[in-house]
């Protein structure tokens, strides 16, 4: 499974990859959620190549959250919104625990 995580700090990427790898074969793609030039285009490129998108609500900008939601809809991808910023919240959502979906 290929997952895009939007939001969080760059140093969390390695930690997320290690811990999510324990849930099965998981490939992580990471976007820090800070709006940049060409934000929409970059997010769409990222999202079209994954199976699932997780937005960490407390760790990304509103602009990136909305851009992610629009890009996921355009690419027909599922989006989970995590209110928790910790890795345990993300692992629970991937494992099928209650999640906020769009």
UniProtKB/Swiss-Prot annotation:
It holds the Pfam family DUF2325. InterPro entries: UCP020408. Belongs to the UPF0751 family. This is UPF0751 protein Dhaf_1351. The lineage of its organism: Bacteria, Bacillati, Bacillota, Clostridia, Eubacteriales.
């Amino acid at each position: 499974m290929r997952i895009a995580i939007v939001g969080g700090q760059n140093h969390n990427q390695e930690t997320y990859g290690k811990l999510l790898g324990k849930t099965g074969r998981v490939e992580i793609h990471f976007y820090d959620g800070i709006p940049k030039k060409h934000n929409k285009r970059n997010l769409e490129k990222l999202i079209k190549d994954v199976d699932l998108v997780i937005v960490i609500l407390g760790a990304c900008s509103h602009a990136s959250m909305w851009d992610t939601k629009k890009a996921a809809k355009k690419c027909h991808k599922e989006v989970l919104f995590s209110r928790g910023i910790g890795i345990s919240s993300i692992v629970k959502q991937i494992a099928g625990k209650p999640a906020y979906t769009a």
